[in-house]
Amino acid sequence: MISSRSIAVSAVFGFGLGFTSVAWADTASDACGALASARTALYSMINAKDVSAQDALNAKVREASTKLDSVLAGMTGADAKAAADFKALWEQFKATRDNQIIPAIYKGNAAEAKKIADGIQSERLSKMWSIMSCK
């Protein structure tokens, strides 16, 4: 005979598993959204012609990056492996962006910035997208 206690334990356990997948989906979705925002703002920055527009877009890049860093820091348990794999690429992505792409933009060399963004950065973006199962 099934006791009400085993039903309650099963219900709580089942709810916990359901909550975990929802939490992963929300966290991954937040990471994907922040990554897309950072990439979109950077691409807009490459195409912007005046410094004030570039500065405003750079602020958006930084804001999205900060949000993504925060989401990654909050990923624990089963999500920690994906976060670690993602973060390794994300750190490379940020370094290239901050040390090569953004300086090229501010020097007026949009073609060089775009070349880097469409090259190695695009490869990294694709890998990060895959790790988080972004859609």
What are the residue ranges of the model-derived segments?
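Bacterial N-terminal signal peptides that target proteins for export
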Residues: 1-11
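Transmembrane alpha-helical segments of integral membrane proteins
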Residues: 100-101
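Extracytoplasmic
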Residues: 116-135
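Extended, amphipathic, non-transmembrane alpha-helical segments
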Residues: 92-96
